[in-house]
């Protein structure tokens, strides 16, 4: 890892060895517009106030959201968008380049990786090209090794694609140059541990996925960290929450401060009720 990548990784993964990513990129991937994202600057400010050290978003939205970034907040620029996102297997299209990420001050780039059908070969080529460019230009690469669509429940996705889909995707991303792998909750702690093992030492963060009860979200994060994850990448469960700042703070307490999920949930309930 060269000097530029090491310097950027120190910001993406903080001094405590943790990465708490708030994903505000759903305007590029969702099958419909999600109303809370209409005010991207406020959502950014809330996540930063709650303890997120990385904000994931598009090249268009950073121009609006930048004033809400703190001095230690990293930008992770999403390089891809989803074509036909309402389908079971949307097509991933690269819509930004590493040169743009560097010009915008990003500390990392992100690529959604969907292995499905006729588009899989092109996806693998794109993944490899981004991995090579990131190594050459010193840019950390966050690869999203996820189910082809994340707008369904874990149970539905597991039934449709299976655990081995996720494990193969995680390993492929690690093989082709990812510096951090983001992946879905596979349904149980033991299976998540196997995903961490498949990454073979490449840091793993757990995706938040579809909307969950707060207690379930915090529990998943606790067991993910216990299984070896270095953090989370959460979107809808933050920006669609009644208090994005409070739920981000609860996530930070579980991941960064190693509170139990029960203790963090109790504090969250108290904060929301005050």
Region spans (language model):
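Alpha/beta enzyme core
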Residues: 19-84, 89-204, 215-230, 253, ...
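C-terminal helical cap(s) of enzyme catalytic domains, especially alpha/beta-barrels
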Residues: 225-228, 239-274
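Short Gly/Pro-enriched loop/turn and capping motifs at secondary-structure junctions
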Residues: 187-188, 210-214, 238-240
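Surface-exposed loop/turn and secondary-structure junction residues enriched for glycine/proline
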Residues: 12-15, 31, 65, 241-242
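N-terminal basic, low-complexity leaders that serve as flexible interaction/assembly modules and, when applicable
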Residues: 1-26
């Amino acid at each position: 890892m060269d000097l530029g990548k090491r310097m950027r990784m120190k910001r993406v993964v903080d001094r405590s060895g943790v990465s708490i990513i708030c994903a505000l990129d759903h305007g590029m991937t969702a099958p419909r517009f999600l109303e809370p994202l209409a005010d991207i600057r406020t959502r950014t400010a809330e996540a930063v106030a709650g303890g997120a050290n990385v904000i994931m978003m598009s090249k268009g939205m950073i121009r609006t959201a930048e004033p809400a970034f703190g001095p230690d907040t990293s930008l992770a620029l999403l390089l891809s968008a989803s074509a036909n996102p309402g389908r079971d297997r949307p097509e991933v299209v690269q819509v930004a380049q590493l040169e743009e990420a560097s010009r915008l001050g990003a500390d990392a780039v992100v690529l959604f990786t969907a292995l499905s059908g006729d588009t899989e070969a092109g996806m693998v080529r794109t993944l490899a090209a981004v991995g090579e460019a990131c190594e050459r230009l010193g840019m950390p690469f966050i690869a999203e090794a996820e189910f082809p669509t994340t707008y369904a429940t874990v149970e539905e996705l597991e039934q449709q694609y299976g655990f081995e889909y996720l494990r193969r995707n995680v390993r492929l991303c690690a093989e082709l140059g990812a510096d951090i792998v983001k992946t879905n909750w596979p349904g149980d702690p033991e299976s998540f541990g196997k995903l961490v093992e498949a990454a073979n030492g490449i840091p793993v963060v757990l995706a938040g996925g579809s909307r969950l009860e707060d207690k379930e979200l915090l529990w998943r994060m606790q067991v993910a960290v216990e299984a070896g994850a270095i953090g989370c990448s959460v979107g809808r469960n933050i920006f669609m929450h009644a208090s994005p700042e409070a739920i981000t703070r609860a996530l930070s307490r579980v991941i960064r401060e190693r509170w139990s999920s029960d203790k963090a949930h109790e504090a969250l309930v108290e904060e929301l009720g005050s």
